[in-house]
């Protein structure tokens, strides 16, 4: 997807809030926008 590994890491190493879909830091425990605690890692593989 990205042209070089640093860019790909920057795009994919995030967590997504299950409540508001905000992008959060990989080390986050709560969402920065809504405070929700249920965060999932961003999917690394693209869907077919």
Curated annotation (Swiss-Prot):
Name of this chain's protein: Large ribosomal subunit protein eL40
One matching Pfam family: Ribosomal_L40e
SMART domains reported for this sequence = Ribosomal_L40e (SM01377)
Q: Which UniProt keywords apply?
A: Ribonucleoprotein, Ribosomal protein
Q: Name one GO cellular component term.
A: ribosome
Note the InterPro entries from the entry. Ribosomal_eL40_arc, Ribosomal_eL40_dom, Ribosomal_eL40_sf, Ribosomal_zn-bd
Q: An example of a Gene Ontology BP annotation on this entry?
A: translation
The protein's matches in PANTHER family, at most eight in alphabetical order, are given as:
50S RIBOSOMAL PROTEIN L40E, LARGE RIBOSOMAL SUBUNIT PROTEIN EL40
A single MF term (Gene Ontology): structural constituent of ribosome
Task: Give the organism, scientific name.
Answer: Methanoregula boonei (strain DSM 21154 / JCM 14090 / 6A8)
């Amino acid at each position: 997807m990205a042209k070089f590994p640093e860019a790909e890491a920057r795009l994919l190493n995030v967590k997504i809030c299950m409540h508001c879909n905000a992008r959060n830091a990989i080390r986050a425990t709560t969402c920065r926008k809504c405070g929700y605690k249920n965060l999932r890692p961003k999917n690394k593989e693209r869907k077919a």
